[in-house]
Structure formats: C-alpha cells, structure tokens
Regions:
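N-terminal glycine-rich phosphate/pyrophosphate-binding loop and immediately adjacent elements
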Residues: 1-52, 208-213, 221-230
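Stable alpha-helical elements in mature extracytoplasmic
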Residues: 26-29, 42, 81-85, 123-127, ...
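Cytochrome P450 core scaffold surrounding the K-helix E-X-X-R motif
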Residues: 27-35, 150, 314-316, 326-330
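Conserved redox-cofactor binding core of oxidoreductases
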Residues: 34-156, 161, 173, 225-244, ...
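FAD-dependent oxidoreductase catalytic-site/capping-region signature
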Residues: 47, 53-101, 109-111, 231, ...
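General small-molecule cofactor/ligand-binding pocket signal
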Residues: 97, 138-140, 206-210, 282
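Glycine-rich loop(s) and the adjacent beta-strand/alpha-helix scaffold that form part
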Residues: 148-151, 155-248, 254-255, 321
C-alpha cells in the first residue's frame, strides 16, 4: 500500500505546508536525547532557545517567549464544532489544558498556531523575510542540491541544479548546513558518498564513509482516523470560499484564518511506558480522506489519533544516483516484532469513539463512516 508523504519544497520547508499547530516535545523527550548521546540537548538547555524563537501573543513567561521572530497565536476563529469537541473530551473525563507547551502536556483544548495576523508564520516568514535585503545573503530558488563535495574529510562545496539545469557549484567559506529534512537530508548524504556502503555501490556511488545509520531509524506518527457525518451543515466541507476569502481580506477574521485542526489533546494511554502522554489527538471539523485530497460529499468531522513514540522503524533507499529520482520510503508502520504499536493505536481508536459518543455531540453526530459500525473487535 502506498501513502502520501508531502514535503515542503518551498521557502520555509514543511513549515509552509503543515497544520501550523505549535507543539514542542515533552521535556523528557529532550532529556532522553541527551541520554542517548546528544550532549547538550536536554530540556534545560533547549528551553532558552524555544523562548528566544517564540513570539507568543500571550506574552513572556517562564516557559514562553513574547518577542521572538516566530509568532504564536490563539485562534481568531473557531468552527462551531470545535468547542463541542473540547466539551466532549471533558465529559469523557479528560482534563482541560489551555497550553500544551506549559507546565503539563496532557489534556484537551485549543491549539495555538504559528500564525501572524491570521496568516501562516512559516520559518521563512519568521526568519528569512526580515533579512532578505542583507548584502551577505543570497537566496536561490528553484534550486536542487545534488551533491556535497568533501575536501580532506570536510564539506567544502555544494553542487546544485537550477530549473533542472546542473553544473552549479558553491564553495563554502565556513560551513555547509544540511537542512533537507528527514527525507532529502539522508538522500543527499548518500548521493555524496556517506551511507551504507553496499547500498551506495549498488548505485555506482563512491563510498567516502560507510555509515549504515544514514537513511535508517526512520520514524513517523501514523494516524488512525474516526470519521462521522455531521447532522448539521456547519463543517468546513461546504464552506463558501468566496465569502471566507472576502472576510479574510477585509477583516483578517473568519474561516480563512483557521488552521482547521483547531483543537485536540494529549493522552497517556494504559500502555504508556513512563509519565509522558503517548497519544496525540487532532479534531478536524471536516471529512478528511487521504489528507483531504479526496472530496467527500456532505458534512462531517474527523478525529485523528497518533502514537507519539512508535517502536516500528523504517528506512530510506536510493532509487538511483540522481537527486531528481525520488527515494524509496519504507515507512515500516506497525512492523515492530511484538505488535506494541498496533496495541496503542487500537487503544487510541477506542478513545476517539468514546469522546465522540459523549452527550456534547448528540446534536451533531451522524453515522460513523470510518472505520464504520462493522468494526467492533480488535481483530
């Protein structure tokens, strides 16, 4: 089965195409990174950088920055179903949480978003736009890095193509920062001769460093979705786009300012291995099939639940020695030997159903479209 893996080939990277929910990792995540060998990456050390980068509209606090370049905002508009979901979560016994990046992560509430004046605040908007006129900054668009040239064991230059035409090369005065993301960074390293030796030779690439870990240990958060029809035509499925656009242009208000996934929560399942929540929920007042790429008629809502720390691992493989040829992504979803990931996902799906079954949804809950009424066992 093939799944869609979108990436942000645009200024700002995937921060220009994501759902804009502003979520840091749990404090223990960073402490664990350091325990695994990433010296200096503990929570105490990274928090000042989170605060420095953040421009939260709520202002400065012990855990938040108020004047950083990345604007973090509260919702300007909520779909009528969003507060219904939050109320239903409370009725189901979950704690309310008005700040998922505060003292505790667990609980349900509204997401803050990386938005400014009702518009997306990507990393390009936050960091690049303010310095575009610097004389020592050159931004090349429509460019694809194809290989890093190493000199005496150090990255010395970058080979790239523009508009598909190769032959360009830039030498590094000081350093090359590799920031192609979880897919393109390992692909570029392998094309440059750093990766599993046998795999590189298979594609005619000279091996500089035999590094089996490059392309490996791939982890992703798989969603399990519960989708219902809505008995009232109030979701984002049939929104008047022209009217929403006009309202946004004139007043910077209305549905055009929404990130759609306006609410959600974090839950510590019975299978959690420590104090951290291990499941995250996103409530979407729309019918999302295949990332919203398939239009579903009528009105509905979707509750997404994902396991935050899967044990399953995947790997990235080259398909050729050409950067233009997309790599093969073997995600390895639900492939862990003891089936632990599947067990957590089943618990998450049950909680999704329990939340939607609460009285708050009685006036809105239509038939369950997915997984459907016939799905009544763990099998």
């Amino acid at each position: 089965r093939s799944l869609w893996w979108p990436r942000g080939k645009v200024l700002g990277g995937s921060s220009s195409i994501n759902a804009m929910c502003y979520i840091r990792g749990h404090a223990k995540d960073y402490d664990e990174w350091e325990q695994l060998g990433a010296e200096g990456w503990n929570w105490k050390n990274v928090l000042p950088y989170f605060r420095k980068s953040e421009g939260n509209v709520r202002g400065t606090s012990a855990l938040h920055g108020g004047d950083g370049p990345l604007t973090v905002s509260d919702p300007r508009y909520l779909n009528p179903l969003t507060p219904v979901f939050v109320e239903a979560a409370t009725q189901a016994g979950f704690d309310a949480n008005d700040d998922f990046n505060g003292e505790r992560q667990a609980g349900f509430g509204l997401y803050q978003t990386t938005t400014r004046d009702g518009k997306r605040c990507s990393s390009a908007v936050a960091y690049l736009n303010p310095v575009r006129k610097r004389k020592n900054l050159k931004v090349i668009t429509k460019a694809t890095a194809s290989r890093i040239i190493f000199e005496n064991g150090k990255a010395g230059a970058l080979v790239y193509a523009v508009d598909g035409k190769g032959g360009f090369c830039e030498a590094a005065a000081k350093e090359i920062i590799l920031c192609g993301g979880s897919i393109n960074s390992p692909q570029l390293l392998m094309l440059s001769g750093i990766g599993p030796a046998a795999h590189l030779r298979q594609h005619g690439i000279d091996v500089l460093v035999d590094a089996p870990g490059v392309g490996g240990n791939l982890q992703d958060h798989l969603d399990v979705c519960t989708m219902h029809k809505c008995t009232q035509d109030i979701t984002y499925d049939n929104i008047n786009q022209a009217l929403a656009g006009l309202r946004f242009v004139l007043f910077k208000q209305g549905p055009g300012t929404s990130n759609v996934a306006e609410s959600g929560g974090f839950w510590r399942s019975p299978l959690a291995e420590d104090e951290r929540p291990d499941v995250q929920f996103h409530f979407v007042p729309a019918q999302l099939d295949d990332h919203g790429r398939n239009k579903v008629p009528g009105s509905g809502f979707t509750l997404h639940a994902c396991f935050l720390r899967p044990k399953s691992r995947g790997r990235l493989y080259l398909t050729s020695n050409n950067i233009q040829h997309k790599p093969r992504i073997e995600a390895g979803y639900l492939s862990d030997a003891d089936g632990f990931d599947m067990k957590v996902m089943l618990e998450a799906a049950k909680q999704s159903r329990r939340i939607i079954a609460q009285p708050a949804f009685d006036a809105y809950r239509g038939p369950e479209m997915f997984p459907g009424d016939t799905a009544q066992s763990d099998a």
